[in-house]
């Protein structure tokens, strides 16, 4: 009986007045979605780094583009936005092709070095995984930012996002280098365990 009395006398939680302004900022749903998006991007960076290690020239780039398209599709689903594969390819080409020194031409050139016996494959293995991972990371971050600002794939301007892409590309290089180092360390551990 005392428990019933205490429960009935407990103050009700204060409700916000109907005319009070809502607090701007992230909601629990948007914070959760942001975490899912960030983890999703990192998973696709890992896949892009792995795909770029394939020793077949140009197949590696095709695989990375396919991975990036799948990432864009999944981010579009996460944010409830429409997806178009042809527009996705166009945005990838516009963003990745526009970064001086690390554009699509650079990736193709690095991929083609795998044709050179011995040293060519090593050159490709050193630089392409970082380029592939950084590009994937930057593309993912561009789409997340654009979607969070209310945009969709149909109104994404690569020119307007180029500076942000370059900034995220630099962050992506660091992330991809870490992923590559972990994969190499795991490979060494596997070899050591086999002997």
Swiss-Prot record:
Keywords: Biomineralization, Magnetosome, Membrane, Transmembrane, Transmembrane helix. It holds the Pfam family DUF697. Residues 1-31 are annotated as: Disordered. Residues 1-28 have a biased composition (Low complexity). The keyword Ligase does not apply. GO terms for cellular component: magnetosome membrane. InterPro entries: DUF697. It is found in: Magnetosome membrane. The chain crosses the membrane at residues 45-65, 90-110, 115-135. It is a multi-pass membrane protein. This bacteria makes up to 60 cubo-octahedral magnetosomes of about 45 nm in diameter which contain membrane-bound crystals of magnetite (Fe(3)O(4)). Does not seem to have an ortholog in most other magnetotactic bacteria. This is Magnetosome membrane protein 22.
């Amino acid at each position: 009986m005392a428990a019933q009395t205490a429960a009935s006398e407990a103050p009700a939680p204060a409700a916000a007045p109907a005319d009070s302004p809502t607090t701007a900022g992230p909601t629990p749903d948007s914070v959760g979605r942001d975490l899912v998006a960030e983890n999703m991007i990192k998973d696709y960076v890992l896949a892009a780094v792995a795909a770029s290690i394939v020793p077949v020239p140009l197949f590696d780039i095709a695989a990375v583009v396919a991975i990036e398209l799948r990432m864009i599709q999944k981010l579009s689903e996460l944010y409830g936005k429409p997806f178009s594969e042809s527009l996705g390819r166009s945005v990838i080409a516009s963003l990745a092709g526009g970064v001086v020194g690390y554009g699509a031409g650079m990736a193709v050139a690095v991929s083609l070095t795998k044709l050179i016996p011995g040293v060519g494959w090593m050159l490709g293995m050193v630089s392409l995984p970082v380029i592939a991972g950084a590009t994937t990371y930057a593309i993912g971050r561009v789409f997340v930012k654009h979607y969070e600002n209310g945009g969709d794939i149909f109104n994404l301007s690569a020119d307007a996002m180029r500076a942000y892409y370059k900034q995220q590309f630099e962050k992506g290089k660091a992330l991809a280098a870490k992923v590559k180092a972990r994969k190499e360390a795991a490979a060494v551990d596997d070899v050591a365990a086999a002997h």
